[in-house]
Amino acid sequence: MNPLKKKPRTHSLQNAPEKPDWLKVKLAFPDPKNNPVAIVRNSLEEKKLNTVCESASCPNLNHCWSRKTATYMLGGDICTRRCSYCDVASGKPFPLDPEEPKRIAESSIALDLRHVVITSVNRDDLEDGGAAHFAKTVKEIRKGLPDCKIELLIPDLKVKQEALEIIFECNPDIFNHNLETVKRLFPEVAPQKRYERSLDVLKIASARGFLTKSGLILGMGETLEEVKECMQDLASVGVSLLTLGQYLQPTSTHLPVKEYVVPQVFKDLRIYGKSIGFKGVFSGPLVRSSYHADEQISWNP
């Protein structure tokens, strides 16, 4: 039986604005035998691992993999939630793979990573939302890479205190949870998420002393004033690091791009973010939550 239970979408690419030149990325490797992208892909395929890089059709895949960095995605490649902007499949997930944490650690060691980002699909079918699976993965990585920085990009876990405690006990170097969009757009963009719930997750983590991080995707119909209000909300709950990037419609069935935000606006928002207290604001059309994540931990222009 096919586990995917997709509802038909009605969006279209026909009325989407034309993609500007600043979003067109090319990356060439003169020596195919030493192509770093192929090296990372082969390692991931060998270990049968999922990455958000591929599952979410990230535009920076080639760039990040050429740096031999990747964001591992736990819990399979089927999400229990369905967001209109996201290219990850939704439906009924398979049971967790108990060997996945060990394989992720083996891949991280083989690639000699110095900054590992671990995220997951939403697993609302699990009592702890997959928190214990995160913990096992962190433990396995630290066995082989004790000096590696570990960033956890977690779902909201429905703000269950028991699940959050499991994450806190991992003691991640960065605690990341993406708000994604402004409050007004949540019902359309992420109907199974709650704006206040996401802020609560970040507030609790900040209060516990963790370096917290969040991200917004622009171009889905928000106004500049709404973005600034959202940034203020994130700063007020203690978020230190912020990423701002351009939304790109994955397929014709996903939410259409409403606007391609010009690079100058991203620059202005970076300045604004610094002015209201963020330690670092990584802002640009191609920026994603884990883009150059190893630099973001200390980035402070």
Swiss-Prot record:
Keywords: 4Fe-4S, Cytoplasm, Iron, Iron-sulfur, Metal-binding, S-adenosyl-L-methionine, Transferase
EC number: 2.8.1.8
Domain of life: Bacteria
Keyword Membrane belongs to the record: no
Any one GO MF annotation of this record: 4 iron, 4 sulfur cluster binding
Location within or outside the cell: Cytoplasm
SUPFAM superfamilies: Radical SAM enzymes (SSF102114)
Sequence ranges assigned to domain Radical SAM core in this UniProt record: 65-279
Gene3D superfamilies: Aldolase class I (3.20.20.70)
Residues annotated to bind [4Fe-4S] cluster 1: 53, 58, 64, 290
CC annotations in GO: cytoplasm
Protein name: Lipoyl synthase
Organism: Leptospira interrogans serogroup Icterohaemorrhagiae serovar Lai (strain 56601)
Lineage: Bacteria, Pseudomonadati, Spirochaetota, Spirochaetia, Leptospirales
